[in-house]
């Protein structure tokens, strides 16, 4: 397994990895948009796979990704994305709230607070809402899982979002973050 030059250096600490997660996830989700389908096809397919994993949509080959917009640290929410999908001519809108955890546990009822902010912002008749916690931990502590379940969040270790045992994409940035050990 190759080691990531992007995510690991000689520092004793790795800086603020959660901020890096916000930026890379934002970029990854936006690269799933159909406007990038021919530019770097392997990268596009990988980004689609990640987006549909977070949306919990299987059998997505027929779905077109019309647009993806992302916001980092909106109302203290790590990342949120608006996605417009075209399923056989029917436009469907999805919004994802993503909380990432590298070091710290969920605290101060934050998942429920963020969910409430999100739900007050979106009209449920127009948007399908998704709540996701992504952690860099290989094993998610049971207390974190319980808090996610209680708040209606799906939870994933980073390697469950996308396995690093894939062929290289056409993007060094993607490869360094998603396909290297760090």
Language model features with spans:
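Charged, terminal alpha-helix-loop-beta segments
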Residues: 1-182
